[in-house]
Amino acid sequence: MTKANSYTKEELIACGHGELLGKNSPRLPVDNMLMIDRVVTINDNGGTFGKGEIVAELDIDPDLWFFGCHFVEDPVMPGCLGLDAMWQLVGFFLAWEGAQGKGRALGVGEVKFTGQVLPGAKKVTYKLNIKRTIHRKLVMGIADATLEVDGREIYSATDLKVGVFTDTSTF
């Protein structure tokens, strides 16, 4: 496997099926729960902390599944889906680094919402700054992230934590 510095939607879906970064690597969700259309850039030496960064995007279409049910006559993207996308990207970073096992969100320090994603928006941009990765018996990534809608920052999250486990039966 050769690590690329950007990924298409098709490649992200392949990751969800264990076909991109290895069968035993952490996987992204697929179908409606994949909240990312492309990874614009990924590296292990950039970002605020010099330990890696990811910039990814989601194209907004008024026909996206959540606008029809959240809420009736008041459609808005659920904030938890943007937060989940951030966790998805931390897990993807660990897979990209070569982690083996199943990724699980472990927590977040602080989350702030200062805006909303509405059906008329065009694009969501996720920006993650990797703070730390641990590759011992425990594999874990910690990152700070923001979500922008059409260039305006509306979510921020600190200390997003994702672990990678070889056995999740007791988790």
UniProtKB/Swiss-Prot annotation:
The keyword Lyase applies. Keywords: Cytoplasm, Fatty acid biosynthesis, Fatty acid metabolism, Isomerase, Lipid biosynthesis, Lipid metabolism, Lyase. It is found in: Cytoplasm. Disulfide bonds: none annotated. InterPro entries: FabA (IPR010083), FabA_FabZ (IPR013114), HotDog_dom_sf (IPR029069). The active site is at 70. Pathway: Lipid metabolism; fatty acid biosynthesis. It comes from the Bacteria. It catalyses: a (3R)-hydroxyacyl-[ACP] = a (2E)-enoyl-[ACP] + H2O; (3R)-hydroxydecanoyl-[ACP] = (2E)-decenoyl-[ACP] + H2O; (2E)-decenoyl-[ACP] = (3Z)-decenoyl-[ACP]. Signal peptide: none annotated. GO terms for biological process: unsaturated fatty acid biosynthetic process. Its EC number is 4.2.1.59, 5.3.3.14. SUPFAM superfamilies: Thioesterase/thiol ester dehydrase-isomerase. One of its GO terms (molecular function) is trans-2-decenoyl-acyl-carrier-protein isomerase activity. One of its GO terms (cellular component) is cytoplasm. The keyword Protein biosynthesis does not apply. Belongs to the thioester dehydratase family. FabA subfamily. HAMAP family: FabA (MF_00405). Necessary for the introduction of cis unsaturation into fatty acids. Catalyzes the dehydration of (3R)-3-hydroxydecanoyl-ACP to E-(2)-decenoyl-ACP and then its isomerization to Z-(3)-decenoyl-ACP. Can catalyze the dehydratase reaction for beta-hydroxyacyl-ACPs with saturated chain lengths up to 16:0, being most active on intermediate chain length. Homodimer. This is 3-hydroxydecanoyl-[acyl-carrier-protein] dehydratase. It comes from Shewanella amazonensis (strain ATCC BAA-1098 / SB2B). The gene is fabA.
